[in-house]
Amino acid sequence: MCGIAGICRLDGQPLNEDARAHVRAMTDVITYRGPDGSGIWQEGPVSLGHRRLSIIDLSGGSQPMQDVDGELCIVFNGEIYNFAELRQELLQAGARFHSSH
């Protein structure tokens, strides 16, 4: 059971570094939900934080996760059991991955 926290300015204005500190404080409060790791990503009006409980993909599941171009970011809590099939479908559609899993 991981933990997710974040701030988003609905007016589109960029967040300052105080927002990162606030998200860090939010993820610190939920450390019990994910004691195995944490991460924060901030860009423009969005700051995302994650606390990780490692069950599957122990070494490569650090979050927040970005696409290979650094344009998209996601925090995710759950398991995708058909990931191999989805990966093949996405590869055939031209998607690029920066991990082997």
What are these model-derived regions, one by one?
Residues 1-101:
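N-terminus-centric sequence/structural signature that marks the extreme N-terminus
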